[in-house]
């Protein structure tokens, strides 16, 4: 299991945020509240556009 952080773009408001690709809780957009990722017991169900995989968070 290789866990990573990903930068995603919300399909509703186009806000970009960095999330964990194996979430243990529902992840919502911090601007509009739309669900962008759901837990599945492993790799999450990402419901937003994945822009890039992040190696380091600045």
UniProtKB/Swiss-Prot annotation:
One of its GO terms (molecular function) is zinc ion binding. One of its GO terms (cellular component) is ribosome. Its cofactor is Zn(2+). The keyword Metal-binding applies. Gene3D superfamilies: Zn-binding ribosomal proteins. Zn(2+) binds at residues 10, 13, 29, 32. Part of the 30S ribosomal subunit. This is Small ribosomal subunit protein eS27. It comes from Archaeoglobus fulgidus (strain ATCC 49558 / DSM 4304 / JCM 9628 / NBRC 100126 / VC-16). The gene is rps27e.
